[in-house]
Swiss-Prot record:
Belongs to the UPF0738 family. This is UPF0738 protein YjbL. The gene is yjbL. It comes from the Bacteria. InterPro entries: UPF0738.
Length: 122
């Protein structure tokens, strides 16, 4: 995946989960897609951002899953802090719920990914 935005850390407050990253450029163009993928090779959930003529992939690795689980349980907004821009990752909870249900008892994602997801989310 090109155009990866790696999440460095997550900060959970009463009203939102803030995902911090180190990124440059494209800030004015980024728009939430409401779509997610799974990167089972790198044990990550991937949120897709739309740009004018391409995509960027927000990589949410397992080190921030505990905070993501809490935000998901409370259905509070998840926002990406990218440079000077804050982007709400619209549709993340619905997509995550779908992916969690799909991963549960599904060897297609690999045993290790399934186990890691079960350990944190299920």
């Amino acid at each position: 995946m090109q155009n990866r935005i790696e999440i460095l850390n997550a900060t959970l407050s009463d009203d939102q989960l803030r995902l911090a990253c180190q990124t440059e450029g494209n800030e004015a163009e980024r728009k939430p897609s409401g779509q997610m993928l799974v990167d089972s090779d790198h044990f990550a959930f991937v949120y897709i951002l739309e740009l004018a003529d391409s995509f960027e992939y927000v990589i949410i690795k397992e080190h921030v899953w505990p905070e993501l689980k809490q935000a998901h349980a409370q259905k509070i907004p998840v926002v990406l802090e990218a440079g000077d821009q804050t982007i709400e990752l619209a549709g993340l909870h619905e997509e995550l719920e779908y992916l969690l249900e799909n991963i549960k008892d599904n060897a297609n994602y690999g045993e290790e990914m399934e186990e890691k997801v079960k350990r944190v989310f299920l």
